[in-house]
């Protein structure tokens, strides 16, 4: 099994090298996305590469271990839905940048069976990208029409109300406001 995973990883990395976009990679580095390796491959192209492989938990976990932007993205796209809960919090803790967190919330976190409850826990956690992922997960849930229960709503509104005084990271503040905009859409 390990040899098959190794072979798939080699095949994926070969495809990544062939699809490399040095200009995009350079621009991303200039914006602070300092991965060990960044091929600069656009998301639609990455999704195309992912479509050539079966969803596979072991392959996804293996790709996630590499500090390569595209491998982390492919890990998200290749993780089977039945395995989402097993990696969710570990991957939030290990997500290096909001770009990865954005795809993590859209593809995995917002599809967890208890996504709303988890997101409320995460917005209460200021470590790393947990709060950011919590707000972005809520944004996706609100877009789908998911409602919070009364206790969750109370916590959400209290944290969001004070976000500018309790949070220094602009990305988290913007994620909070983004989620609030979609929350308010549901209230109308």
What do these predicted regions represent?
Residues 1-188:
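Alpha-helical scaffold domains
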């Amino acid at each position: 099994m390990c040899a098959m995973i190794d072979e798939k990883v080699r095949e994926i990395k070969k495809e990544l090298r062939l699809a490399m976009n040095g200009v995009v990679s350079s621009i991303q580095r200039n914006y602070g996305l300092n991965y060990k390796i960044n091929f600069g491959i656009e998301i639609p192209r990455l999704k195309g590469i992912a479509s050539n492989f079966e969803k596979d938990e072991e392959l996804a976990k293996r790709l996630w271990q590499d500090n390569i932007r595209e491998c982390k993205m492919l890990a998200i796209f290749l993780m089977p839905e039945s395995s989402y809960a097993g990696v969710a919090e570990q991957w939030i803790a290990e997500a290096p940048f909001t770009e990865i967190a954005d795809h993590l919330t859209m593809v995995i976190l917002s599809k967890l069976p208890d996504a709303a409850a988890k997101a409320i826990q995460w917005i209460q956690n200021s470590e790393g990208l947990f709060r950011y992922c919590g707000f972005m997960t809520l944004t996706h849930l609100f877009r789908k029409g998911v409602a919070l229960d009364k206790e969750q709503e109370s916590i959400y509104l209290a944290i969001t109300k004070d976000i500018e005084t309790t949070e220094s990271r602009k990305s988290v503040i913007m994620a909070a406001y983004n989620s609030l905009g979609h929350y308010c859409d549901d209230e109308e």
